[in-house]
UniProtKB/Swiss-Prot annotation:
Phosphoserine found at: S100
Lineage: Bacteria, Bacillati, Bacillota, Clostridia, Eubacteriales
Cofactor binding description: Binds 1 Mg(2+) ion per subunit.
Post-translational modification: Activated by phosphorylation.
Source organism of the structure: Clostridium botulinum (strain Hall / ATCC 3502 / NCTC 13319 / Type A)
Protein name (record): Phosphoglucosamine mutase
Length: 449
């Protein structure tokens, strides 16, 4: 059995790879490992709007109850809401059934510990080991020792909306906002929060039918929202993904504003308020060099991690940083939540736009995105580190870096899933970096022939 857990829980095509049987086993093992030896434990269960959610929830909950834990089912709710409410309700764990931005045929199961954080690799391995060993030493419970399922009646959604609203001071009156809910988990929470704060709210893709989640909508397909914002003269647009743990924005001219710009704007604002701990934001190696240049001007440090919001969070926790995130719109505000939170991000951004008295596009001028070129070099899995060993490749990388002279960079990343090495170049001249990236990729490919 290979490793079951990926970077974001267990994922696969529902009913084929992620079966009801596997969901039952994950519920049983997760509940046993995460609550071992405590009182009758409580586990919060939420999901996005996928048609397979009901099937997987039934199986997952059966597993949870079989080891004597209580399952509190809150229905359709954003992933970050489960992270927050697990803490608020003093639950022993939280589980989300969602495949985030993936197409509808996929689903996933992701656990949070009692503090609202994603599980460590060690805990995930313990859950997998229990399943692999066929639940050896797990007692079979009967009678009154079996757990109960509690259906929650909307209080969780209300509590999450109130929490999200509390993260900004004042209101959003006078702001005209377009929201794209991706027919996903934010179709109630985001709309209500913005309305209750006084914004004029226009919404698209907020009629989930179980199969339209992420379909030509949300943060992975923002084209309709870009058009809508301009057509309806909105001050800004905000696009969520299926489970609303990320958010991308649209300025009033219809331009897509990615996570790098959001980090720059929010980082500057936090510094102004004296809340940017250690004057630092945490980003990944894939963030645009333009962000580093912009932050340098603002006298803000950037610290880089591997790609993945779990690595960003690790770095933030280690050094108590206030904000970090990815280009994809996964932004973590550690003062507010323990994971990327699309609604909290959207509210921070909207509040900054309102309070600044500037247009959103003016605020975005804080940063100039450098042209970026990404070229794949085909490399056998056992030779993916050739760029670290081969003298000619190393010399070519050094030469390119020297010629870019601080206004560009070379980044090489082996793919974790395919026999590829990704060659990424940034610089001021698109034509030049395009030529250099293709040349370097070709050199790498020739060396492994």
């Amino acid at each position: 059995m290979g490793r079951m857990f990926g970077t974001d829980g267990v994922r696969g095509i529902a009913n084929k790879e992620l079966t009801a049987d596997l969901a039952y086993k994950l519920g049983k093992a997760g509940a046993f490992i995460l609550t071992e030896g405590t009182h009758r434990s409580k586990i919060l269960v939420g999901m996005d709007t996928r048609i397979s959610g009901d099937m997987l929830e039934s199986a997952l909950v059966a597993g949870i109850l079989s080891v004597g834990a209580e399952a509190i089912c809150v229905g359709v709710i954003p992933t970050p809401a489960i992270a927050y409410l697990t803490r608020k309700y003093n639950a022993d764990a939280g589980v989300v059934i969602s495949a985030s931005h993936n197409p509808v045929e996929y689903n996933g199961i992701k656990f949070f510990n009692k503090n609202g954080y994603k599980l460590s690799d060690e805990l995930e391995d313990s859950i997998q080991a229990l399943i692999r060993d066929d639940f050896k030493d797990v007692p079979v419970l009967t009678g009154e020792n079996i757990g109960r399922k509690i259906e929650e009646d909307g209080e969780a959604i209300r509590d999450y909306i109130d929490f999200a609203k509390s993260t900004i001071k004042g209101d959003l009156k006078g702001l005209k906002v377009a929201l794209d809910c991706a027919n996903g988990a934010s179709y109630i929470t985001s709309v209500e929060a913005f309305k209750e704060l006084g914004a004029e709210v226009h919404v698209i893709n907020n009629k989930p039918d179980g199969i339209n989640i992420n379909r030509n909508s949300g943060s992975t397909h923002p084209e309709d929202l870009m058009e809508y914002v301009v057509k309806n003269n909105c001050h800004m647009g905000l696009a969520f993904d299926g489970d609303a743990d990320r958010c991308l924005a649209i300025d009033e001219k219809g331009n897509l504003i990615n996570g790098d710009f959001i980090l720059a704007i929010c980082g500057k604002e936090l510094k102004k308020q004296g809340r940017l701990k250690k004057n630092t934001i945490v980003v990944t190696v894939m963030s645009n060099l333009g962000l580093d240049i912009a932050m340098k001007k603002e006298e803000i440090n950037t610290i880089k991690t591997k790609v993945g919001d779990r690595y960003v969070l690790e770095e933030m926790l280690k050094n108590d940083y206030a904000i970090g995130g990815e280009q994809s719109g996964h932004i973590i505000f550690s003062d507010y939540n323990t994971t990327g939170d699309g609604l909290v991000t959207a509210l921070q951004l909207a509040h900054i736009v309102k309070e600044s008295g500037k247009t959103f596009s003016e605020l975005c001028s804080i940063m100039k995105e450098l042209p970026q070129v990404l070229v794949n070099a085909k490399v056998p899995n056992d030779q993916k580190d050739i760029y670290l060993k081969d003298e000619e490749i190393k010399s070519e990388i050094d030469t390119i870096t020297k010629n870019l002279d601080g206004s560009g960079r070379v980044l090489i990343r082996p793919s974790g899933t395919e026999p590829l090495v990704r060659v990424m170049l940034e610089g001021e001249n698109q034509k030049e970096i395009d030529k250099l990236a293709h040349g370097l990729a070709k050199l790498i490919e020739n060396k492994v022939k």
